[in-house]
Amino acid sequence: KRLHQESFAFEPASIDALFLSHAHLDHSGLFPLLVHGGFSGRIYCTHGSAKLLPVMLNDAAGLYERDLKFENRRRQRKGKEILDPIYTKKDVETALGLCYPVSYRQALPIGKAGKASLTFYDAGHILGSAITEISFTEEGRTKKLVFSGDLGKQRRRHDSFLCRWQNPGNSFSPGPA
């Protein structure tokens, strides 16, 4: 029900790209809805996430279709308006076709004229999970935007990476690698 009542606060067609931290549905589940709304950019993800997404999104779409069919039968019995699907399995297939898998620690030029770069690092959460680093130059200075959806418990996977950003050039980290 909630999906039919809410809408995005932006136009999905205005988005140039998506960066997926990992394939769990709370991070990827609305991709088909974004596609249905006009998104057609790249979905950057790791190879592991690209392999999990078909299972996750198709399963979610199947559950959504089943629940919608049940809800529409209930609505029909009460004389209420039937709900149209807000996305379809075709939207899932389109979203999957927009996925652009990137290897861990591979700097990939992105954006107009490749003026930014994307690098994924293993987040240790699930297969394919990533800490995402986007580097770009602004006013002659290189800047880095780093984010992650979830981090795993194995400290060794991300401590040295995070240490660089908290204390660049300290005794634990001689500076950016």
Question: Where is each model-derived feature located?
Answer:
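Short, well-ordered alpha-helical microsegments
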Residues: 27-28, 129, 168
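Core dinuclear metal-dependent hydrolase active-site scaffold
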Residues: 1-13, 94-156
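An acidic- and aromatic-residue-enriched active-site/binding cleft used to recognize and process polar
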Residues: 48-49, 123, 164-165
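Divalent metal-coordination and catalytic microenvironments
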Residues: 22-23, 53, 125, 150, ...
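Intrinsically disordered, low-complexity polyampholyte segments enriched for Lys and acidic residues
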Residues: 90, 112, 167-170
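Cationic, amphipathic, low-complexity alpha-helical segments enriched
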Residues: 154, 161-166, 172-177
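Pre-active-site segment of Zn-dependent metallo-hydrolases
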Residues: 1-41, 45-95, 99, 151-157
